[in-house]
Amino acid sequence: MSFIKKIKHYFADPADLPQDEAPDSVPGLVPPPSNFVPVYPEPTYSDTVSKKGTIVRVVRHTASKLTKHGDSSQSLSTLPNNDISVGEYVEPLPSVPGWLKQNIFSHFGTRLLHYLRSLFPIMNWLPRYNWNWLVYDFIAGITVGCVVVPQGMSYAKVATLPAQYGLYSSFVGVAIYCIFATSKDVSIGPVAVMSLVTSKVIANVQAKDPNYDAAQIGTTLALLAGAITCGLGLLRLGFIIEFIPVPAVAGFTTGSALNIMAGQVSSLMGYKSRVHTNAATYRVIIQTLQNLPHTKVDAAFGLVSLFILYLVRYTCQHLIKRYTKFQRVFFLTNVLRSAVIIIVGTAISYGVCKHRRENPPISILGTVPSGFRDMGVPVISRKLCADLASELPVSVIVLLLEHISIAKSFGRVNDYKVIPDQELIAMGATNLIGVFFHAYPATGSFSRSAINAKSGVRTPLGGIFTAGVVVLALYCLTGAFYYIPNAVLSAVIIHSVFDLIIPWRQTLLFWRMQPLEALIFICAVFVSVFSSIENGIYTAVCLSAALLLFRIAKPSGSFLGILKIANKFDDDENSIDVVRDIYVPLNQKGMNPNLTVRDPPAGVLIFRLQESFTYPNAGHVNSMLTSKAKTVTRRGNANIYKKASDRPWNDPAPRKKKNAPEVEDTRPLLRAIILDFSAVNHIDTTGVQALVDTRKELEIYAGDEVEFHFTDINNDWIKRTLVAAGFGKARDATKYTSRSIEVGSAAPLRDIETPMAPGNSRIVMPSSVRVRPFDEEEAIESSIPAIVSEDGADSDTISVSDDKDKKVEGHRPSQDPTFSHHEYYPVISTTYPFFHVDVTSAVVDIQYRHVLDVNYKPKIVTNEVENENIEHSDGAA
């Protein structure tokens, strides 16, 4: 068609067009039934063709006055005496090629560059680095370095590795992490729980093959765990961490802390060789108590050190609160208490042992090699990797949970965003590079991260200065490390690990918030103490997964009713009352029981799902819908079966006593079911099949087609799935000759300025309008919600009474030159009339077509209905 013909075609009257071009009708766009209460003066219709060739129905109205409900003398505003047009809107359903094009192939090069750049967050903030940041990072780095050196050696002792391996892990963790980090506070290095897991892994592998060296096992474990963690981050799978709740993490962390403390008491008292520290925690405690008579001089070093550590801690905390001027001094004193106690203990040990170096009276650390003597390409054994395969899940879980939970907590406290996927990459890269230094697995440390944050660190570059302190210790202080008492190191470990135990108040809080999660916490601690740390971790993870699946399989869906509410802004006579209907659970959970929640319109069920509609909960939702429908509605035809033998065995006949009088069933027929999908983010094949089965069962019960309406669908793929299963429109297109369309105005409203409008602090009504106080009886007796139909009724209407003498309550744009032409557009696609914006729109649509159908006679549907399957795209029975 040429351009001139297109112009003529556009301006031509549809009646003058050729028969093959003039539309006979537009499906669904017809006047309402004659017995329907009119909201506006009868409109006139004309079909035309838009510029794009789309058939559009234009609706013309005469001007109508709108009055406040119950007060016909006060006009709120008047519609301009101009045309109001409502066009079409067809929303395309998503497709797999379209998704791939949009999310994968669209701007692929730009996406790839952005992804590669995101792997190195240091590129974003390093160009803006300044001297002020440098000063704070230097102070924080040195402070953390003074803590990480004694802790690194102590935790290496927990891991049953030589002390230098703890220093290697400490150096690599703080030096490499800053390149990939999204958290400025986290300090990566040896930690108590991961060191304990490493010791268990070493013991298990050496039990299979004693030829493996402990350091080799620790390095290989770091390689494998780091590779898995880094891979999860590169694939953006960090969300899997969210499947384990906080109580589960707290459970096995508490169990691990108890195990570590129990294992260090024997070293504190000087008889470590008499206690098997790799046994279950309760056995370690029993053996420790049994060997108390074998206590040695080491106990003097250990117990005194432990007492001083706690004394300094609580004294400094008290002085910080009392003398705020010197809180910086007290803070540094508190932070350096572990380093100072080791220095003092080492000096005393040197005085005691310097003349008896070959046979010291106390247990001392011994020789620590200087520098990075073990640095190099590691030798990885395939057999060792195979032996470690069964130990990897526990190691990876501990690495993930400890680090991410610490990073997120400091991100919340200090107001910056932590990216879990990038943190996994950072942790994985740190452990992979640490293999070349013969480091064992490292992750985020809560105690050192807290010190880092309180020291005023500004960027992750503070880890470089911490690494410098570790290097200085490795090259200059290893000679002094020889005389460090093991009892003092045990005191430092017990003091550090004690904070990992969840206090009883937190346990009580778990119980008050979520009793089931509190039980998971208790079970994790119990299994960790009486079995093993590995079993405690598995117990916490499995119970958390079971609880999650249970909640998905048994969603707390609710059937909705209508509650009329009003907002009272002031107590004076100038207050404004806003009355509206809302849909709330019929059981009134969480509401005042004195309120009256009305049932939805007769024959209509409104159900709100609280979870995604997937295979675990499909059967449960099906049972809830069918059970409720058969309770509140009657069967469409009680005599559907001609003979008793025709009735299925699972469909018992109604029972009545002999000679009992016939009682008329006043329950309504089932007309429609409205499903509120506002909380549904996904629906799978099983869920759709459950809906198809539910519809089939209820249609046999009702004796006619039951409409399934869906509201608040927030995912295009859900619409695609429902449409493929035959939902979204009536299956018998000839039966429903009218429907309503939710339309929205393209012009702003100017009647009432609300607090949401700029420059206003309260609602201001036009000066010509008197505002009445709230009338409770009027609110209760008010009628059905606004009916906004395709006849062009304005979407700004508030409510419509079922009494013909009452007027429409609401407001319209005032007379203004800018409102010379009002255009209204469908809010959602008009292709699928059973998809709605909200529950109110769905109820309006059903009432518009059913509520006045007094001669409605349902047709009889036998039990020989053809099986419906979701393979039928039209959903026909």
Swiss-Prot record:
Alphabetical keyword list: Membrane, Transmembrane, Transmembrane helix, Transport
Disordered as annotated region, ranges: 643-663, 793-821
GO terms (BP aspect): chloride transmembrane transport; sulfate import across plasma membrane; sulfate transmembrane transport
Coiled coil regions in record: none
Biased composition (Basic and acidic residues): 801-821
Record's function text: High affinity uptake of sulfate into the cell.
Protein name as catalogued: Probable sulfate permease C3H7.02
